[in-house]
Each structure stands twice: as structure tokens, then as C-alpha cells.
A protein has these predicted regions:
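Transmembrane helix segments
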Residues: 161-198, 202
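Aromatic- and glycine-rich beta-strand/loop motifs that create alpha-glucan
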Residues: 1-30
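Alpha-helical transmembrane segments and their short interhelical loops
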Residues: 106-164, 223-227
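Junction motif at the cytosolic side of a transmembrane helix
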Residues: 229-257
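Short amphipathic alpha-helical coupling elements at transmembrane boundaries
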Residues: 10, 14-18, 78, 82, ...
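Hydrophobic alpha-helical transmembrane segments of multi-pass membrane transport/permease proteins
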Residues: 21-46, 55-68, 176-180, 234
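Hydrophobic alpha-helical transmembrane segments of multi-pass membrane transport proteins
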Residues: 53-123
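Short hydrophobic, aromatic-rich alpha-helical segments embedded in or entering the lipid bilayer
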Residues: 6-10, 185-224
């Protein structure tokens, strides 16, 4: 356990240093989404000002899930393209655990960047209140538990790179469309627990949306469904990764990047 905690700290420090080193890209990413939210909010304010908080919170959910998923996939693909994935695989520790830690690190950094985006919106959009940031801080524990479903599906998606090498267009489209649809339809699915367990981040998505509408459904049942969803997605990621690792070993392509 001490080993994994130390590894997580090292990975997080590494991710932060990379974000600072390439600060232009990091700042541009934060500001771009903030500007987009502010522009759409100003358009909405002319006819439906009351819908702005709903829009901002829904967009934040999509932004966190989309960016976290992409960050997870890209962190694994980077090991792939740099030729270091084989070294991780040969590590005496659990290969899947190492990838999971990378996924957790990428997700946390994406959540932090998204919170900076929301903070900028507070400065430039009157209908986005400081209390909204406090509400997001309140639901952070739920977010941190639910991100494991994103990590699982992210590892599953990144596994395709072992076979097809370049999948950037594929995972970008899957991410934008999948999490866009889930954010739009999460509340409709909320009454169907089985479906909530089968779609990544679906229960957390619906719970967060309802929370911002004044319906606090964060309880033991909610956490139970989220944890089951996490386990299903993590197992799915493990199975797909295992399959493509075997295929790569057969063809000898694991070290050929």
C-alpha cells in the first residue's frame, strides 16, 4: 500500500510539473472552456436567465467527464508511443494497478482544471455565483469515487491502441458523444438502477444534476450504485486490456512503437 501511495504522489507531482511546464496549453484549455461557458450564458441571459445555473452545472459535468476520460486515455497512450508501456508491463507490481494510478492522477488534475474554469466564470458571469463553487466542493467526494468508472472505460479504450496504434479520432468522438448523451439523459435513466450500473458515470451524473436542482439524493443507495458501476467498468477495462496484451505478445508488437 505504501508503494502505491508513493507512486501516486510521484505521478501527481509529475503531472503537475508537466502542466506547469506546458503552461500555455494548460491556461488556454482552462480559459477556452471558461470563455465558451460565458458566451453561451450571455446568450441565454437574454431570454432564459434562470436556466444559466442549470446550463453551467450540466456543462461542468460534461467537461469533467470528457476531459478526465481523454486525459486517462492520453496518459496511457503516451506510455504506448514513448515505448515505456512494456517496461510498466514487466514491472513486478500489478500492471493494471499502475495504469489505474495514472488514471486517478489524470482525473484529479482534470477536475482541478475544471474548477479553475468555473472560478473564471464566476468573475465574468453575474448569474454564476460563488456559492456554486462551494456546492461543487461539497460533491467532490462523490466525484472522486465515481471517477473509477471513467478510469475503467478509459483503460478499455486505450487498450485499442495496442492493436491500432493511433486512435485519437476514435476516443475523442466517443468521449464527446457518449458523455454528451449521458449528461442529457442521465436524469431519465435515474429510475432504472440496472442501466445506471451499466453506463459509465451515469448515476453520479444524474445525482449531481439533481443536487443542483435542489434534490439532494446523495445517500448510501447512491454510493452503492456508483461503486457497482465503478467495479463493472474497471473489470471491463481489465478484460479488454488483458485481451489486447495477449494479442500484442503473440504478434510481438508490444515493444514496437
Amino acid at each position: 500500500m505504501k508503494y502505491y501511495l508513493s507512486l501516486f504522489i510521484q505521478e501527481f507531482e509529475k503531472a503537475c510539473k508537466i502542466a506547469i511546464r506546458y503552461k500555455f496549453d494548460t491556461i488556454f484549455n482552462i480559459c477556452f472552456w471558461a470563455v465558451l461557458i460565458v458566451i453561451v450564458s450571455h446568450v441565454l441571459s437574454t431570454k432564459h436567465p434562470g436556466n444559466i445555473p442549470i446550463f453551467v452545472n450540466s456543462f461542468m459535468i460534461w467537461l469533467i467527464t470528457n476531459n478526465s476520460f481523454i486525459a486517462i486515455v492520453e496518459s496511457i497512450m503516451k506510455e504506448n508511443t514513448q515505448g515505456t508501456l512494456e517496461q510498466l508491463y514487466l514491472n513486478a507490481r500489478s500492471f493494471y494497478s499502475l495504469l489505474t494510478i495514472k488514471g486517478v492522477t489524470a482525473s484529479i488534475l482534470s477536475i482541478i482544471e475544471s474548477m479553475f474554469t468555473l472560478s473564471l466564470c464566476v468573475l465574468f458571469e453575474a448569474n454564476v455565483k460563488l456559492s456554486m463553487i462551494l456546492q461543487w466542493i461539497y460533491i467532490l467526494p462523490l466525484l472522486f469515487i465515481a471517477i473509477f468508472s471513467l478510469i475503467g472505460i478509459g483503460i478499455a479504450c486505450a487498450s485499442f491502441a495496442l492493436r491500432y496504434k493511433n486512435i485519437s479520432t476514435f476516443y475523442s468522438m466517443v468521449s464527446a458523444i457518449l458523455f454528451g448523451i449521458l449528461t442529457y439523459g442521465a436524469i431519465l435513466l435515474n429510475k432504472k438502477p440496472i442501466l445506471m450500473m451499466l453506463f459509465p458515470f451515469a448515476k453520479a451524473n444524474a445525482t449531481i444534476q439533481l443536487f443542483f436542482k435542489g434534490k439532494n439524493l446523495i445517500n448510501i443507495d447512491t454510493y452503492f450504485i456508483i461503486i457497482i458501476n465503478d467495479l463493472i467498468m474497471m473489470i471491463l477495462g481489465y478484460v479488454i486490456l488483458k485481451y489486447y496484451l495477449k494479442e500484442s505478445k503473440k504478434t510481438g508488437s508490444l515493444s514496437k512503437f
